[in-house]
């Protein structure tokens, strides 16, 4: 393929597309660059898989540490398990790509994005999303694209396309919008309690830039002499499908109109119908075309049954404005909440129920040393002090499966809940704890990620975390049939599975903190998105009202089993003194007091212990070690050793000075041992600190009030 090099500019920032330079054996490849960030994206198509009823698409995004000029740590000195950030980027690529492939496609597809170079300005994720579309077009895979993505930031009152890391950090919005020629297809955002109108305006602003990238891809395809492949679906014998439809349609329609059915009851009734048809087919003669077709395609019954269920559920919503559980389109399911569900050994807990969706969230408070170190990926010397983990055990949907480590879905849902709550967390200075939330999905019938947001808000308040405002969330759905559009509030499982959209919105009563929109159709207009966002606000506020009836403010006290944190600041040149050679000093303080000590490079010292007195003891020791001495200061101390010309006194941890024999008393002392002994407690005053840092002490000229204050201070510090 001929080499092509194209550029497109946004606000003076170029995106460069290089085709034909790298990966010549991949189905399609592109090197997409901005600044010094370069991402190689490939798309490859393999043989069709037999006996499957889904699109076998795999998307992998990987970052090589050489891209940032670094060598991996560990014994092997090579990249290991992918960090969470790369998994989330893989999902970011997958989500807008998947709905643009034909539903009938069964070929193995693999999209791989490798970050080959990365600067400190340009995030590579949106480049990888756009690159996936370009590589797919070049590979001539059937695809309803092109598709492109941009990031939108908000700094002050100005929207910015593809902001730098610094601009994202300084702004109130981090929004990624992906779209096709048919409309917006994906939105992912974190926001600092922004009003709905700002979010809608940002999506519109971003989609205009997406259009430019789509046009650039169309021009690139034409320049390469290619076409955008739109293959017709393979012809399928409808005999078996028609047989199933004739026997199942009436019963399915009746079941879906039984609004009193719970999810398990509805599923069981549908299974009975499906089993009856399967039995009927098995009883046909072996040579019967229906039985032959069913034997040849063992997925046909399930797929046709799903299609019929989907058709009648959607028609019921479009024609009657009623859902399978009898709710109105904008009606939220029954909500209930509990806090303090678990004993206080768990620092905070919240149980959120939305009928058959149930999430138990727990909050654990940790020390600064418990923060997650992100040094293994591209983010140098960064630590996460808020962690949100989401678990989805198989029993939550009544299934049995092996329990494995979290998959991409669990990681993605946890990240969304985390992003939803970050804007309302207290600052490190106000609340120095590391916070870990774990959301356990105990029962699932749709919208467990937003259930996690709600349950986690309850757990945070139960744990005494002074959040700025409580956050609630709701998942919106969509049924689109031609020009007919119905937006559904608080979708349940069947509406998510058979609908056209999953749009999750989280926020406070002030504004939105996070949203995530995924489509199953090629695109959506801004008007429909705007309607969904505003409809979600009403749902969020309704749910928030129920939550506040359970707990309306964070608890004043944290759990008695949570660590007590004390924070002090020392001069950075004193850090070495506190740590000591080989960590000897700090280990000694820890062993003596039982407290845990974390020291940051700026001299911030955080001391933690479940027993607050232990933390105070460690604090006093460190303050004593690092205190600046002044002539005339009075302290209580203890004699540590005696020499012929005087006695040495430890009067602060790590601080020792000498009393000359002439300064022991206001009369002549013949021998030091006649006046003091090792172990004696004495009141001393700093007489002089010489140019070598030696501390000379005296027992003379000390007022009784000074002596009393010194004894009192020493008693407190013990």
From Swiss-Prot:
PROSITE patterns: KH_TYPE_1, S1. It catalyses: RNA(n+1) + phosphate = RNA(n) + a ribonucleoside 5'-diphosphate. GO terms for biological process: mRNA catabolic process; RNA processing. Keywords: Cytoplasm, Magnesium, Metal-binding, Nucleotidyltransferase, RNA-binding, Transferase. GO terms for molecular function: 3'-5'-RNA exonuclease activity; magnesium ion binding; polyribonucleotide nucleotidyltransferase activity; RNA binding. Its EC number is 2.7.7.8. Involved in mRNA degradation. Catalyzes the phosphorolysis of single-stranded polyribonucleotides processively in the 3'- to 5'-direction. NCBIfam families: polynuc_phos, PRK11824.1. This is Polyribonucleotide nucleotidyltransferase. It comes from Nostoc punctiforme (strain ATCC 29133 / PCC 73102).
């Amino acid at each position: 393929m001929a080499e092509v090099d194209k550029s497109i500019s946004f606000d003076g920032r170029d995106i460069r597309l290089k085709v034909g330079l790298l990966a010549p054996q991949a189905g399609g490849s592109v090197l997409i660059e901005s600044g010094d960030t370069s991402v190689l994206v490939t798309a490859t198509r393999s043989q069709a898989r037999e006996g499957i009823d889904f699109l076998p698409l795999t998307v992998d995004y990987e970052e090589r540490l050489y891209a940032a000029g670094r060598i991996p740590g560990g014994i092997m000195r090579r990249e290991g398990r992918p960090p969470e950030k790369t998994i989330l980027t893989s999902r970011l690529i997958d989500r807008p790509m998947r709905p643009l492939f034909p539903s009938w496609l069964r070929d193995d597809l693999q999209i791989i994005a490798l970050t080959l170079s990365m600067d400190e300005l340009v995030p590579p994720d949106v480049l990888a999303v756009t690159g996936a579309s370009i590589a797919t077009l070049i590979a001539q895979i059937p695809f309803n694209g092109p598709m492109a993505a941009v990031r939108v930031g908000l700094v002050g009152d100005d929207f910015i396309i593809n902001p730098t890391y610094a601009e994202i950090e300084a702004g109130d919005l981090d929004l990624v919008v992906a779209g096709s020629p048919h409309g917006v297809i994906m939105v992912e955002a974190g926001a600092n309690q922004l009003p709905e109108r700002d979010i809608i305006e940002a999506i519109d602003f971003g989609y205009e830039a997406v259009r430019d990238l789509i046009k650039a891809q169309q021009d690139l395809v034409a320049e390469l002499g290619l076409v955008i492949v739109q293959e017709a679906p393979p012809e399928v014998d409808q005999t078996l499908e028609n047989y199933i439809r004739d026997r199942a349609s009436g019963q399915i329609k009746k079941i879906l109109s039984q609004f009193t059915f719970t999810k398990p009851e509805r599923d069981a009734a549908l299974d009975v119908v499906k089993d009856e048809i399967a039995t009927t087919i098995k009883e046909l003669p072996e040579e019967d075309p229906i039985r032959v077709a069913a034997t040849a395609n063992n997925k046909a019954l399930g797929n046709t049954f799903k299609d019929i269920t989907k058709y009648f559920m959607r028609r019921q919503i479009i024609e009657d404005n009623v859902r399978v559980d009898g709710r109105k389109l904008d009606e939220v399911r029954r909500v209930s909440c509990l806090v303090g569900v678990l004993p206080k050994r768990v620092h905070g807990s919240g149980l959120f129920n939305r009928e058959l969706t149930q999430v138990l969230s727990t909050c654990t408070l940790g020390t600064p040393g418990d923060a997650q170190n992100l040094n293994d990926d591209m983010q140098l010397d960064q630590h996460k002090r808020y962690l949100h983990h989401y678990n989805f055990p198989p029993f939550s949907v009544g299934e049995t499966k092996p329990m494995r480590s979290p998959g991409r879905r669990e990681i993605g849902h946890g990240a969304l809940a985390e992003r939803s709550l970050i804007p309302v967390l207290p600052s490190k200075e106000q609340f120095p704890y590391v916070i870990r939330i774990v959301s356990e999905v105990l029962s699932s019938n749709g919208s467990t990620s937003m259930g996690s947001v709600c349950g986690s808000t309850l757990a945070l308040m139960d744990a005494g975390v002074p959040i700025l405002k409580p956050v609630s969330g709701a998942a919106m759905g969509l049924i689109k049939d031609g020009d007919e559009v119905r937006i559904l509030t608080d979708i349940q499982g069947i509406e998510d599975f058979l609908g056209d959209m999953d749009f999750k919105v989280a926020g406070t009563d002030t504004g939105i903190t996070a949203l995530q929109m995924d489509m199953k159709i090629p695109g959506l207009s801004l008007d429909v998105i705007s309607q969904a966002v505003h409809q979600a606000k009403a749902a969020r506020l309704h749910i928030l009202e129920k939550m506040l009836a359970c707990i309306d403010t964070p608890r004043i006290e944290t759990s008695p089993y949570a660590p007590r944190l004390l924070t002090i600041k020392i001069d950075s040149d004193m850090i070495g003194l506190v740590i000591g050679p080989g960590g000897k000093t700090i280990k000694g303080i820890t062993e003596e007091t039982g407290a845990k000590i974390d020291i940051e490079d700026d001299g911030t010292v955080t001391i933690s212990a479940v027993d607050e007195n232990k933390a105070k003891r460690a604090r006093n020791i460190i303050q004593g070690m690092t205190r600046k001495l002044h002539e005339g200061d009075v302290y209580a101390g203890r004699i540590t050793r005696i020499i012929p010309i005087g006695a040495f006194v430890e009067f602060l941890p790590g601080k020792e000075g000498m009393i000359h024999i002439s300064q022991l008393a206001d009369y002549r002392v013949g021998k030091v041992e006649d006046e003091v002994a090792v172990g004696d407690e004495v009141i001393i005053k700093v007489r002089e600190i010489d140019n070598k840092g030696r501390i000379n002490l005296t027992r003379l000229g000390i007022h009784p009030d000074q002596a009393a204050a010194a004894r009192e201070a020493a008693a407190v510090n013990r």
